[in-house]
Amino acid sequence: MSTKTVPEPEPHVLAVDDSIVDRTVISRLLRSSKYRVTTVDSGKRALEVLSLDRNVHMIITDYCMPEMTGFDLLKRVKESAELKEIPVVLMSSENSPTRIRRCLEEGAEDFLIKPVRPSDVSRLCNRVIMK
């Protein structure tokens, strides 16, 4: 009798950025590491995706976006009983210690400075998703 193992599903990352270039970069980095990636262009769209698919293992979001900032998205996720366990990582091209501290205090898992390096994404995913 042979035993077949069911492969583990690929971890699912929701990437949120109003810049198509940054969404593409993050998506390629994650997909090359065997992650399933959904990309959206706003915090509002991210909440719509999360309302339909709760099987998200991590959210990576830009800090500065129109309509709803990444910080606002972080707060909404952490205030939600259904979503609060999803790790949220923020990114920004501005290296502001006050902004970074504020995000971490609000519950962000980490804060990346753009341009994001492949080693940053690999380290982050190994630490956050694989724990």
Swiss-Prot record:
InterPro entries, A to Z: ARR-like (IPR045279), CheY-like_superfamily (IPR011006), Sig_transdc_resp-reg_receiver (IPR001789)
Keyword Ribonucleoprotein: no
Sequence positions bearing 4-aspartylphosphate: D62
Keyword annotations from UniProtKB, A to Z: Cytokinin signaling pathway, Cytoplasm, Nucleus, Phosphoprotein, Transcription, Transcription regulation, Two-component regulatory system
All residue ranges annotated as the Response regulatory domain in the record: 12-129
Reported consequences of knocking out the gene: Dwarf, narrow leaf, low tillering, abnormal hull, viviparous and low fertility phenotype.
Pfam families: Response_reg (PF00072)
Tissue expression from the record: Expressed in roots, leaf blades, leaf sheaths, shoot apex, flowers and panicles.
Inducing or repressing factors: By cytokinin in roots and leaves.
Chief location bin: cytoplasm
GO cellular component: cytosol; nucleus
Coiled coil segments of this chain: none
Intracellular or extracellular location(s): Cytoplasm, Cytosol; Nucleus
Post-translational modification: Two-component system major event consists of a His-to-Asp phosphorelay between a sensor histidine kinase (HK) and a response regulator (RR). In plants, the His-to-Asp phosphorelay involves an additional intermediate named Histidine-containing phosphotransfer protein (HPt). This multistep phosphorelay consists of a His-Asp-His-Asp sequential transfer of a phosphate group between first a His and an Asp of the HK protein, followed by the transfer to a conserved His of the HPt protein and finally the transfer to an Asp in the receiver domain of the RR protein.
GO biological process, alphabetically ordered: cytokinin-activated signaling pathway; phosphorelay signal transduction system
SMART domains documented for this protein: REC
Similarity comment: Belongs to the ARR family. Type-A subfamily.
Function, in words: Functions as a response regulator involved in His-to-Asp phosphorelay signal transduction system. Phosphorylation of the Asp residue in the receiver domain activates the ability of the protein to promote the transcription of target genes. Type-A response regulators seem to act as negative regulators of the cytokinin signaling.
Protein name per Swiss-Prot or TrEMBL: Two-component response regulator ORR3
Gene behind the chain: RR3
